[in-house]
Amino acid sequence: MSDKPDMGEIQKFNKSKLKKTETQEKNPLPSKETIEQEKQAGES
């Protein structure tokens, strides 16, 4: 067993088989407005 990858396998790979996917943020960061509202809600 060698540590080097099999380059022949990589060159044979058919990129057209891959599907284009839209990446979507699963847990987007809150906006500055949201953070400010939460800070104010916590203070009162």
Curated annotation (Swiss-Prot):
Q: Where is the composition biased (Basic and acidic residues)?
A: 33-44
Judging by the UniProt lineage, the source's domain of life is Eukaryota
GO molecular function per UniProt: actin monomer binding
As stated in the Swiss-Prot or TrEMBL entry, residues carrying the post-translational modification Phosphothreonine are: T23, T34
According to its UniProt record, where is this protein mainly located?
Answer: cytoplasm
User: Where are the N-acetylserine modifications?
Assistant: S2
What subcellular compartments does it reside in? Cytoplasm, Cytoskeleton
> What is the name of this protein?
Thymosin beta-4
Q: Which organism is it from?
A: Notamacropus eugenii
Lineage runs: Eukaryota, Metazoa, Chordata, Craniata, Vertebrata
Name the encoding gene, please: TMSB4
